[in-house]
């Protein structure tokens, strides 16, 4: 029997301090050469054990082998020059120096497949692997070749599909596409963003997910969120299109958020990764706070389709805080799972009593 309310993380977890400076995005590696290769494997083992000890059900790699959730993938592609950089506005809210697309993009070799094989050897639990989505990749580059966000996105979709198929062959059970750009460029999402995502999942023999959030707890994101008003209804613009898509699982943030949780109704029928852990604060949720968020979500999603998760990745947090939040996620899910199982037993007993009365 499949476990009810299986827990997972949205993506990144803090790296060990011997591998990279903690609590920092884009943190450079402290090791080189063969030491870095082995160090990354050791970090994968540590990340796995952190999740196992916390009782997380669906394991991720914690993004231990990458410096950034988007650019590490792009670094492995041809047609992109990391020395030729331009300043662009990422997610339409902050300036960043990014590499330039200078020619046709392609994937000469697999990017994360060896890492996935290694993680598969370490655990029998289900594995979810996150890779960037086509639109978010486009939004993290300067394009001097295709001169069209849509054309570049379609090329990335084909490349991501190649990578995803090999990840599945390596033993990955769920492929997650990270698309924070979906929360910003609504017209493009509906015109071609979801279609490109469908191209990326084409032919995959596994479950697929899309993660759409309001970002890490960094200043650029928290400042942006202050401009969004008392209700964050961005999901309302994109959920109807996603509801009709072939994506199996849709992720959204709910904990300590201004997102009206009833927006989940727009994607009823899909499996939902409900963000029940706030990654923008060092305050560790209580199990009851997590449980309260999950109970609210259950008004709009069937229990068998609810996947408790974190709002986003936790790279900027300390390992102690991240560990506490993982424990809270599991404990909160346990509370609600036990409530649901108790209700189910009561309903079964009630039915038995009714049948006995008839007989």
Model-derived features: where do they sit?
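Domain-level signal for soluble alpha/beta catalytic cores
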Residues: 1-359
């Amino acid at each position: 029997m499949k476990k009810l309310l299986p827990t997972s993380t949205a993506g990144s977890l803090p790296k060990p301090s011997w591998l990279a400076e903690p609590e920092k995005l884009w943190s450079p590696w402290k090791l080189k050469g063969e030491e870095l290769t082995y160090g990354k494997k050791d970090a994968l083992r540590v990340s796995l054990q952190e999740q196992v000890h916390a009782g997380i059900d669906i394991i991720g790699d914690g993004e231990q082998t990458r410096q950034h959730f988007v650019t590490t993938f792009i670094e492995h592609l041809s047609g992109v020059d990391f020395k030729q950089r331009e300043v662009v506005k990422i997610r339409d809210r902050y300036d960043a120096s990014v590499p330039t697309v200078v020619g046709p993009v392609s994937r000469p070799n697999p990017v994360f497949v060896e890492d996935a094989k290694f993680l598969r050897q370490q655990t029998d639990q289900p594995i979810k692997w996150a890779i960037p989505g086509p639109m978010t990749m486009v939004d993290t580059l300067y394009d001097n070749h295709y001169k069209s966000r849509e054309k570049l996105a379609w090329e990335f979709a084909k490349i991501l599909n190649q990578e995803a198929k090999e990840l599945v062959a390596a033993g990955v059970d769920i492929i997650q596409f990270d698309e924070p750009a979906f929360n910003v460029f609504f017209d493009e999402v509906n015109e071609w963003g979801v279609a490109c995502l469908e191209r990326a999942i084409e032919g995959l023999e596994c479950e697929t997910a899309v993660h759409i959030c309001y970002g890490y707890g960094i200043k650029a994101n928290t400042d942006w969120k202050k401009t969004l008003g008392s209700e964050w209804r961005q999901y309302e613009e994109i959920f109807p299109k996603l509801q009709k898509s072939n994506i199996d699982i849709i992720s959204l943030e709910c904990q300590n958020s201004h997102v009206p949780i009833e927006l989940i109704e727009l994607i009823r029928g899909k499996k939902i990764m409900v963000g029940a852990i706030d990654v923008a604060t060092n305050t560790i949720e209580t199990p009851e706070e997590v449980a309260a968020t999950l109970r609210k979500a259950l008004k709009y999603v069937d229990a068998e389709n609810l996947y408790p998760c974190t709002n986003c990745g936790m790279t900027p947090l300390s390992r102690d805080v991240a560990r506490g939040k993982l424990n809270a996620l599991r404990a909160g899910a346990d509370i609600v799972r036990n409530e649901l199982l108790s209700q189910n037993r009561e309903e079964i007993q009630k039915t038995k009593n009714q049948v006995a009365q008839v007989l």
